[in-house]
From Swiss-Prot:
Gene that this sequence comes from: levF
Pfam families: EII-Sor
Domain of life: Bacteria
Membrane topology, from the record: Multi-pass membrane protein
Primary role: The phosphoenolpyruvate-dependent sugar phosphotransferase system (PTS), a major carbohydrate active -transport system, catalyzes the phosphorylation of incoming sugar substrates concomitant with their translocation across the cell membrane. This system is involved in fructose transport.
Organism: Bacillus subtilis (strain 168)
GO biological process: phosphoenolpyruvate-dependent sugar phosphotransferase system
Location(s), subcellular: Cell membrane
Family annotation (InterPro entries): GatZ_KbaZ_carbometab, PTS_IIC_man
Protein name as annotated: Fructose permease IIC component
Keywords: Cell membrane, Membrane, Phosphotransferase system, Sugar transport, Transmembrane, Transmembrane helix, Transport
Bilayer-crossing regions: 2-22, 35-54, 64-86, 90-110, 149-169, 181-201, 206-226
Length: 269
């Protein structure tokens, strides 16, 4: 791995670490982070495949109250580096990502506990009207979030390929298979949570059509994407026509009422 690749990986790690807190650019999501890492390491295809697989798993990962979700940023960046540099399969990448996400969860809690100090300092600066101090506290807290992903990434990037291959090769098959099965279960849970959140009756037929086509046809992802786009455009056009027809009908009804009122006024006069 060249020095330029290591620098680019550290930049990606910093961006994903900060984005995992800001939740605006969504660059910490596996589909984005793994793709960027794959692009830097020269294996974009593996990055996209691993990112898409991990994204399905991460659909069910979210913070609920004080319960911290697994760390998608560390899992995405480091698992992609290990899979590509050690020439491993997607199954091994999923197994490594699940373990890294659990370890990153503890690291996230540790870093967020440290940033509480900066929050209290920012409150003090706010009372004193020190805007510059508040900005410094925000930036410092984000630096800690960036280092949370950058330091493990640097350690993994500096490890030799042979050492990584030896480490992954020594993992027992029972652990690897177990984590792969667990990852598959997490995918199903993530899908169920998304469908539950999108519990809109008039959209359910589209879900059923998609599942039936996936089960009984040989469509690939490109075909499903094109079909979904066509159905979305068709649905939008139908809804627009119905809305326009309803607006015309409402306008005609209101016009007839207005004429009737004018006649009443004439009679009263």
């Amino acid at each position: 791995m060249s020095s330029l690749q290591i620098i680019l990986l550290l930049i990606i790690a910093a961006i994903t670490g900060i984005a995992s807190v800001l939740d605006e650019g969504q660059t910490h999501r596996p589909l984005v982070a793994c793709t960027l890492v794959g692009l830097v390491l020269g294996d974009l295809k593996t990055g996209i495949i691993l990112g898409g697989t991990l994204e399905l798993m991460a659909l069910g990962w979210m913070n609920v109250g004080l319960a911290m979700a697994p760390d998608t940023a560390i899992a995405s960046v480091i698992s992609t580096i290990l899979v590509i540099t050690a020439d491993q399969g997607i199954g091994e990448g999923i197994a490594v990502a699940v373990a890294l996400a659990a370890a990153g969860q503890a690291l996230t809690i540790f870093v967020r506990t440290i940033t509480v100090f900066f929050i209290h300092r920012a409150d003090q600066y706010a009372k004193a009207g020190n805007i510059k101090g508040i900005e410094i506290m925000h930036i410092t807290a984000m630096v800690f979030q960036a280092l949370r992903v950058m330091i493990p990434t640097l350690i993994v990037a500096l490890i030799s390929v042979s050492a990584v291959q030896a480490f992954l090769g020594n993992i027992p098959d029972v652990i690897t298979k177990g984590l792969q099965i667990g990852g598959g279960i997490i995918v199903v849970v993530g899908y169920a949570m998304v469908i539950n959140m999108m519990n809109i009756p008039y959209l359910k037929p589209f879900f059923y059509i998609g599942f039936l086509l996936a089960a009984f046809t040989d469509f690939n992802l490109v075909g499903f994407g094109a079909l979904g786009l066509c159905l979305a455009l068709l649905y939008q056009q139908v809804m627009q026509k119905q809305s326009a027809h309803g607006a015309v009908a409402a306008a005609s009804d209101s016009g007839s009422v207005a004429v009737y009122d004018d006649d009443d006024d004439d009679l009263d006069a």
